[in-house]
A protein has these predicted regions:
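A general sequence property marking short-to-moderate contiguous segments
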Residues: 1-3
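Active-site-adjacent loop and "lid" segments of alpha/beta metabolic enzymes
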Residues: 5, 9, 15-16, 27, ...
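N-terminal carbohydrate-binding accessory modules
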Residues: 10-37
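Structural preference for beta-strand elements that scaffold enzyme active sites
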Residues: 36-41, 74-77, 112-114, 132-133, ...
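Catalytic domains of carbohydrate-active enzymes, especially glycoside hydrolases
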Residues: 63-79, 266
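Short loop/edge segments at beta-strand edges and connector loops
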Residues: 117
């Protein structure tokens, strides 16, 4: 059970990380400081398991993006390939055919656009089309990707993946060594990224990407443990992005409110960017914690 008796020793053991300052980022005029924001998700792949987030065409994507922005999203994350086990692999041309018209439409509406991909060619083309952030879901060694991010003065969400990409079916590290594995990954990647001129990024532990995580309660425990410890990445000096897990095992038909619960845990871990399919259900949690607490005037 998650209780103060569990959380307080964790926070005290890593007090330096908990209190560590992180950089303020500015993306195309929008400032992201050390407080929580939402990254609203639009899935352009029909293979996505989160059916409510799917947009089948440009008008649907634009409608969903506008709605999520009104509901509280600071930025919109779009992807053309699902990371699900049975989802089709989509090549560069296929992804760009789906992504580019949506990027154009969202930019024309004045929205901030993040593109989720693990392919260098897709990322570079998205940046050239005007996307302001790349949500990188793979262990890309090619400096061309990072140089393109730096050249366009764009942002980067640097995701940990146990394998080469979010689609890789590999064993995940044991829960008690997971943070150490992730920390090593990020330190190595940050050296590469910094040398390519990238100076706007979020750290994302990527705990939803492992295809062979255990099912049922063990999966939920694994993800929530990693989520609650994600504040430890603050010691790297960059803001932290986390995805709201759906916890289907627990929520069943009420899965659409799962992200509300996960948002509470994310805020306890001082997350800066909450990647959410359910912006309207998550934003009240952010607002409540913003207006409540010691020092707030009734």
């Amino acid at each position: 059970m998650i209780t103060p008796d569990v959380l307080l020793p964790l926070w005290e053991a890593h007090r330096a990380a908990l209190d560590h300052p992180v950089r303020t980022l500015e993306i195309d005029g929008r400032v992201f400081d050390d407080r929580p924001y939402q990254l609203g998700v639009i899935n352009l792949s029909r293979d996505s398991s989160y059916r409510e987030s799917i947009a089948h065409d440009v008008p649907a994507a634009l409608y969903r993006a506008r709605r999520m922005t009104i509901e509280g999203a600071a930025m919109i994350d779009i992807g053309a390939e699902s990371t699900g086990t049975n989802a089709d692999i989509v090549d560069v041309d296929g992804q760009l055919a789906t992504l580019l018209p949506v990027i154009d439409a969202l930019l024309a509406d004045g929205l901030l656009v993040s593109v989720e991909t693990y392919l260098t060619d897709v990322a570079v083309a998205a940046l050239e089309a005007g996307a302001q952030v790349i949500n990188l879901t793979g262990r890309v060694d090619d400096p061309a990707l990072y140089e393109a991010v730096g050249r366009h003065d764009a942002g980067l969400i640097l995701c940990y993946t146990p394998g080469e990409t979010a689609r890789s079916d590999v064993d995940v590290p044991p829960v008690d060594t997971m943070i150490d594995e992730q920390m090593t990954f990020f330190r190595d990647r940050l050296d590469l990224v910094a040398g390519c001129g990238v100076d706007k990024l979020w750290i994302d532990p990527g705990f939803g990407f492992a295809l062979n995580l255990p099912d049922g309660p063990d999966r939920v425990r694994y993800q929530t443990d990693n989520l609650l410890q994600s504040f430890r990445f603050r010691e790297l000096g960059w803001p932290v992005c986390v995805t709201m897990a759906s916890a289907v095992y627990l929520f069943h038909d009420e899965v659409r409110v799962a992200e509300t619960a996960m948002a509470v845990l994310a805020l306890l871990a001082k997350a800066n960017l909450l990647r959410s399919h359910e912006v309207a259900r998550v934003q009240p949690v952010l607002d409540m914690l913003e207006i409540c607490g010691p020092g707030q005037t009734p």
